[in-house]
């Protein structure tokens, strides 16, 4: 098991450069400080780590266990992905069996780590609540959730809740630069900015994009957008500006080119349009941005409901061309 994990770590940079101790964690300073206090006291309550993907929740749990128990911490921790093993049978069998066995004298307690706990069924959560009460003497539970509101209140009330925020821009870019140096990858500053924008504070996604782009050679903005399957923002802005200038046919041709060259769906296009509307590179009054954002939302809803991509996006460009006439003096 450990050998296969090591192979994966060598292949995936997100695993290879995953922090192993609390001191190595990027950002989340306040949370790390509180977790270090638990290590110092060798005691802690049940924990609920909540926040968006890629913000370090699972990593923090592993680092906490490592700092508590040492290099062999995995023998004192049961890790389950609750989205795969979410039913009451798993809770009653695996978790109960692990929790009921006593720990060695030098180990204060064992840890049950439930990743994606917000995907557990209601019955499984009720069973978990009872186990948390029964085995507090030997076991601590760490629950990880993207949506903590899906965790039943009786469990939330038994946990210390830690809310992980998206990582700060400077921390993401600094980490990416460091990884690029370790892997001897050449990367443009503009590409770092693009990776950060695309990852939206998700460090795991940022590292995966970096690794994928690095496979093509020097990491540039173009290679970044190529590996994520999105159009370069510059080209999206060109399409918008053509439509607003009243060049409907040219805008339509640009749209067709983008969809063919990048394999974009209608939803992909409208999401990128929505992002670029608020770019400082597009000079239109805020009142028009509001109208376009509202229209983009309407078009996306129709696309998700199954409407034809080409017809809806052409209608969107036509509306932009109509709005553009009002912009002209």
Curated annotation (Swiss-Prot):
Q: Which domain of life is it from?
A: Archaea
For ATP, which residues are the binding ones? 51-58
What keyword terms does UniProt attach to this protein?
Answer: ATP-binding, DNA replication, Nucleotide-binding
InterPro entries per UniProt: AAA+_ATPase (IPR003593), ATPase_AAA_core (IPR003959), CbxX/CfxQ (IPR000641), DNA_pol3_clamp-load_cplx_C (IPR008921), DNA_Rep/Repair_Clamp_Loader (IPR050238), P-loop_NTPase (IPR027417), Rep_factor-C_ssu_arc (IPR023748), Rep_factorC_C (IPR013748)
* GO annotation, biological process: DNA repair; DNA-templated DNA replication
Q: What is a single cellular component term in the Gene Ontology annotation?
A: DNA replication factor C complex
The yes or no answer to whether the keyword Lipid metabolism is present is no
Subunit relationships: Heteromultimer composed of small subunits (RfcS) and large subunits (RfcL).
**What protein am I looking at?**
Replication factor C small subunit
The record lists the organism as: Staphylothermus marinus (strain ATCC 43588 / DSM 3639 / JCM 9404 / F1)
């Amino acid at each position: 098991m450990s050998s296969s994990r090591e192979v994966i770590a060598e292949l995936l940079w997100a695993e290879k450069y995953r922090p192993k101790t609390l001191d190595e964690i990027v950002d989340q300073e306040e949370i790390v400080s509180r977790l270090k206090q638990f290590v110092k006291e060798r005691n802690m309550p049940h924990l609920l780590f909540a926040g968006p993907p890629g913000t370090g929740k699972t990593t923090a749990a592993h680092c906490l266990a490592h700092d508590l128990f040492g290099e062999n911490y995995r023998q004192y921790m049961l890790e389950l992905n609750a989205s795969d093993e979410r039913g009451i049978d798993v809770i009653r069998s695996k978790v109960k069996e692990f929790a009921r066995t006593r720990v060695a004298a030098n180990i204060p307690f064992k840890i049950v780590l439930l990743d994606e706990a917000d995907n557990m069924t209601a019955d499984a959560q009720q069973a978990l609540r009872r186990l948390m009460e029964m085995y507090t003497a030997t076991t601590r539970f760490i629950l990880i959730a993207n949506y903590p509101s899906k965790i039943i209140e009786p469990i939330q009330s038994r946990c210390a809740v830690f809310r992980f925020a998206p990582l700060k821009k400077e921390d993401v870019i600094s980490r990416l630069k460091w990884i690029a140096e370790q892997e001897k990858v050449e990367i443009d500053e503009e590409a770092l900015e693009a990776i950060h924008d695309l990852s939206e504070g998700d460090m795991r996604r940022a590292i995966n994009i970096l690794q994928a782009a690095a496979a093509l050679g020097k990491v540039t903005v173009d290679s970044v957008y190529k590996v994520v399957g999105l159009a370069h923002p510059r080209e999206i802005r060109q399409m918008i500006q053509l439509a607003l200038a009243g060049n409907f046919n040219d805008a339509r041709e640009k749209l067709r080119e983008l969809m063919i060259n990048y394999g974009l769906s209608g939803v992909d296009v409208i999401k990128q349009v929505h992002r670029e509307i608020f770019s400082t590179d597009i000079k239109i009054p805020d009142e028009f941005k509001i109208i376009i954002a509202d229209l983009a939302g309407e078009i996306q809803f129709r696309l998700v409901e199954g409407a034809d991509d080409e017809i809806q996006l052409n209608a969107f460009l036509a509306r932009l061309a109509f709005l553009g006439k009002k912009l002209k003096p």
